[in-house]
Amino acid sequence: MKPTHSPKTYRVKSFGCQMNVYDGERMAEMLDEKGIEPAPEGEDADLVVLNTCHIREKAVDKVYSDIGRLTKGKTQTKAPMIAVAGCVAQAEGEEIMARAPAVSMVVGPQAYHRLPGMIDAAVAGKRSTDTDMPADAKFAALPKRRKSAPSAFLTIQEGCDKFCTYCVVPYTRGAEISRPFSALIDEAKKLVEAGAKEITLLGQNVSAWTGEDAKGRALGMAGLIRELAKDPDLKRVRYTTSHPADMDDELIATHGEVEKLMPYLHLPVQSGNDRVLKAMNRSHTAESYLRLLERFRAARPDLALSGDFIVGFPGETEAEFEDTLKIVDEVRYAQAYSFKYSPRPGTPAATMERQVPKEVMDERLQRLQAALNRDQAAFNAGSVGRTCEVLVERTGKHPGQWLGKSPWLQSVWFDGDVAIGDLVQVELVEAGPNSLAGQLLETVAA
């Protein structure tokens, strides 16, 4: 490629999980420090970072679609500088560089702290790829947090050692690593100083976090949550995503004892059938999962539950799928996420026999989503008449309207004289399938 001008504006487009949202925010902070400004809404950017997800095949296809859209009908001098980051970059970096000559750089999720130097190389006319996995070095090199939304993400752990047979995460994010306790306390403090009232702890397997406090005492995630909750200016703590194998007694107790830990738990089960769970290498049964949920509900009776499901895993029969519907009927999730199985190259499940036909997966997904939507609507309807604290996150669709989140992660719309970042008391007066309408009562904290 030829040398080009230094970009003056940027846009980061993140796909997929909350971890990618966090990574996208950190990349934006690095670009800010480099003197590159966010492109105004509706205007083309000089630099576009596609922060990609590799969980599903459609997400990979979308990357190439976006590259084509960004370059269509444009000469090299008019087209933006393109960086592909994230898990697709990690898994398919060489193919991207070969297939998409318009891409200037490919950077994996554990190497994006080197993005500023790669931009300099692109300006000099050099394409580059960096998919190393030094996650600890990445966090040490990132800039300090200087701005925050009322609800902020904090990555405490990366990677996964579970090796579910359908999942690419161990190959794209690497082995489990935990960030040091002191670094997390410092970053959380910076987020709160920058305006965060709520922090969501993130990890591919967040409850696997381990560390030592300032006195050298061993801690799990429950201990970290208890320490974070001591900050009087931090009002709420959440975490996602967990594996049932790493939910210990202390974490269960923390849900009942730490008021700032919100009454919401996202705990994927994936299937309600034990044979399928074993083929997935999930290391739990449907029964052990249900008993675990019972313990969480005993500790925090108002707990809202969320989960993940995969339909059409190789070999799944109709009877096995119906076991998934049974577990949905028993748990009654407040919200959940469901997907058709998507074979990912390099995973054991991709080469398993008895791949389920697409039309069967489509029909099963439709039935599962109908059950999950029914339960979410019922949970929201059951909230009507309740008074709760809502964190104001953004303006609504008309003047004076606001959107915030309840403790149970429900979207709540209401009118009133408030500001983004306020904690307010709201009476929930009307339920929709995906949100609730509320009546403002009072402001708790500004």
UniProtKB/Swiss-Prot annotation:
EC number(s) given by UniProt: 2.8.4.3
Domain Radical SAM core: 146-378
PANTHER family, per database record: CDK5 REGULATORY SUBUNIT-ASSOCIATED PROTEIN 1, MITOCHONDRIAL TRNA METHYLTHIOTRANSFERASE CDK5RAP1
Lineage: Bacteria, Pseudomonadati, Pseudomonadota, Alphaproteobacteria, Sphingomonadales
Catalyzed reactions: N(6)-dimethylallyladenosine(37) in tRNA + (sulfur carrier)-SH + AH2 + 2 S-adenosyl-L-methionine = 2-methylsulfanyl-N(6)-dimethylallyladenosine(37) in tRNA + (sulfur carrier)-H + 5'-deoxyadenosine + L-methionine + A + S-adenosyl-L-homocysteine + 2 H(+)
Primary location group: cytoplasm
Stated role: Catalyzes the methylthiolation of N6-(dimethylallyl)adenosine (i(6)A), leading to the formation of 2-methylthio-N6-(dimethylallyl)adenosine (ms(2)i(6)A) at position 37 in tRNAs that read codons beginning with uridine.
Chain sites annotated for binding [4Fe-4S] cluster 1: 17, 53, 87
Residue ranges annotated for the MTTase N-terminal domain, each copy included: 8-124
Gene Ontology terms: cellular component: cytosol
Record-annotated TRAM domain positions: 381-442
Similarity section: Belongs to the methylthiotransferase family. MiaB subfamily.
GO molecular function annotation: 4 iron, 4 sulfur cluster binding; metal ion binding; N6-isopentenyladenosine methylthiotransferase activity
Subcellular location as annotated: Cytoplasm
Necessary cofactors: [4Fe-4S] cluster
Protein name: tRNA-2-methylthio-N(6)-dimethylallyladenosine synthase
Domain of life of the organism encoding this protein: Bacteria
Binding positions ([4Fe-4S] cluster 2): 160, 164, 167
Cofactor stoichiometry and binding remark: Binds 2 [4Fe-4S] clusters. One cluster is coordinated with 3 cysteines and an exchangeable S-adenosyl-L-methionine.
Keywords of this entry: 4Fe-4S, Cytoplasm, Iron, Iron-sulfur, Metal-binding, S-adenosyl-L-methionine, Transferase, tRNA processing
The organism of origin for this protein: Erythrobacter litoralis (strain HTCC2594)
Self-association state and partner proteins as the record states: Monomer.
